[in-house]
Amino acid sequence: AQALVDPGTVQVTSHSYFEKEADASRDLARPDGALLEDALLPWARGMVRPRPAAGETIEARILSSLELARLRHEPEAWLLGTLHRSGGTETLEVPAGSFVVDVLTAEVAGGSGSRTWTFWVEHDAPHRIIRWTRSDGVDARLLGTAREAYWNENAERYRQAVEALGLSPRPPRTP
């Protein structure tokens, strides 16, 4: 599925092999100040509006996640959301090190269940997401970082660069 965002509408297109779903395309009127649940990661980094000030809570309409709509076989819908930024910073330890972070939460209510996203975002630029969780059990932590010309490092000899990030190289593809 994909969502194309315009100032007043969001066009959602999906393709499915499930019975009674097939291919679908629909336009949803976009309320002022609304955002997509799928855009919460860039929202937490300050790249998507609205941007709550420190200690502020904002109510917003949030378009349900394309991922969750797909997995639950239900149409996307505008849900009620509460966006909050913590009033101060805290220090967070993850495998990649220790970071001073801001904590942001997004509560999404409605559909087939409410969920809460929590983001620990590096306080200083570039405002990397250091950790994020979702109330359904998703928990992601920054394992490592490297500022590299990665587009040049795609051969077998760069295998150790992958391992240095705490990741395992993918197995070779089979024919």
Regions found by a protein language model. Give the residues of each.
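N-terminal trafficking/processing presequences and adjacent post-cleavage segments
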Residues: 31-65
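Acidic, serine/threonine-rich low-complexity disordered tracts
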Residues: 1-28, 57-175
